């Protein structure tokens, strides 16, 4: 039997205490029925001299970790889609985990027309999360997202080009937990002369990706811990989500953003970790 570290033990104890506190303090109803539907739109401006003038004001919307289930439903997804379209994005990216349990979910076909309603002139891109590969869901995810109008990436690369010839780069890595991420084969294609965006589900990929010319990494996976304690932060974070847990970080010239996601897994609770849609606006400083 694998021994538990002191830190893991303490986190488990805090988790049990927090669950008890939520129940005893009447916070359970808030964490179960209110906060999971309090979707925040977070806005960030990304500045770089590598961003061409033609891409100044270019708007990217990220959503992540829908975990469609009985707890985050199709009605919730409709609200998300309306919110995203109202922001008038140029590009939409989904950073993994569309369905909580792909092998048991009963409404795959109903998801497709909702995803088709998302509009962005430069397209809709998505990557795999661990739940998309899990439960024999790899092919299901690709079929569903493609039918919904998304380009599905696994260790992919492309450039976005304007009529004036200006470009930015987008790369993606397969899921770290259940996929086969190809760091060198994918990221060696990036140029240090172009502004680059990396899509990867697990944020701690940045421990390796900052060795490459990545300017902006967009990730999800952690749900912001899903349950946080004041002055302590997330009680439990998943594998590959221990270092970067939520929000914006900067390491050298790389900005790393960890979206808190939309749905829930394991426990149908969110506390001090509201679901999130993120809007990024590119700003040229050249």
Curated annotation (Swiss-Prot):
The keyword Amino-acid biosynthesis does not apply. It comes from the Bacteria. Its cofactor is a divalent metal cation. GO terms for molecular function: metal ion binding; UDP-2,3-diacylglucosamine hydrolase activity. A divalent metal cation 1 binds at residues 65, 67, 97, 223. InterPro entries: Calcineurin-like_PHP_ApaH (IPR004843), Metallo-depent_PP-like (IPR029052), Metallophosphoesterase_sf (IPR051158), TAT_signal (IPR006311). Residues 1-31 form the signal peptide. GO terms for cellular component: membrane. Belongs to the metallophosphoesterase superfamily. Keywords: Hydrolase, Metal-binding, Signal. Transmembrane segments: none annotated. One of its GO terms (biological process) is lipid A biosynthetic process. Pfam families: Metallophos. Predicted to be exported by the Tat system. The position of the signal peptide cleavage has not been experimentally proven. This is Uncharacterized metallophosphoesterase YkuE. A divalent metal cation 2 binds at residues 97, 130, 221. It comes from Bacillus subtilis (strain 168).
């Amino acid at each position: 039997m694998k021994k538990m570290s002191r830190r893991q033990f303490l986190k488990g104890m805090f988790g049990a205490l927090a669950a008890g506190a939520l129940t005893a303090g009447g916070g359970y109803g808030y964490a179960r029925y209110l906060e999971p539907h309090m979707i925040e739109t977070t806005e960030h401006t990304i500045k770089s001299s590598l961003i061409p003038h033609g891409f100044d004001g270019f708007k990217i919307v990220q959503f992540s970790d829908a975990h469609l289930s009985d707890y985050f439903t199709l009605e919730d997804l409709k609200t998300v889609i309306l919110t995203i379209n109202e922001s008038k994005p140029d590009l939409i990216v989904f950073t993994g985990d569309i369905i909580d349990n792909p092998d048991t979910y009963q409404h795959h076909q109903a998801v497709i027309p909702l995803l088709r309603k998302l509009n962005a002139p430069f397209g809709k891109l998505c990557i795999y999360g661990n739940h998309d590969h899990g439960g024999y869901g790899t092919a299901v995810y690709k079929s569903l997202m493609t039918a919904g109008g998304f380009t599905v990436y696994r260790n992919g690369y492309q450039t976005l080009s304007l009529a004036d010839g200006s470009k930015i780069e987008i790369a993606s890595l397969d899921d770290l937990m259940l996929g086969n991420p190809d760091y060198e084969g994918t990221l060696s294609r990036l140029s240090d002369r172009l502004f680059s965006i990396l899509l990867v589900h697990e944020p701690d990929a940045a421990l390796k990706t900052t060795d490459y010319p990545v300017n902006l990494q967009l990730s999800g996976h952690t749900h912001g811990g899903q349950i946080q304690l004041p002055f302590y932060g997330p009680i439990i974070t998943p594998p590959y989500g221990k270092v970067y847990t939520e929000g914006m970080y900067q390491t050298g010239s790389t900005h790393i953003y960890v979206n808190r996601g939309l749905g829930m897994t394991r426990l149908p609770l969110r506390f001090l970790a509201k679901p999130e849609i993120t809007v990024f606006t590119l700003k040229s400083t050249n």
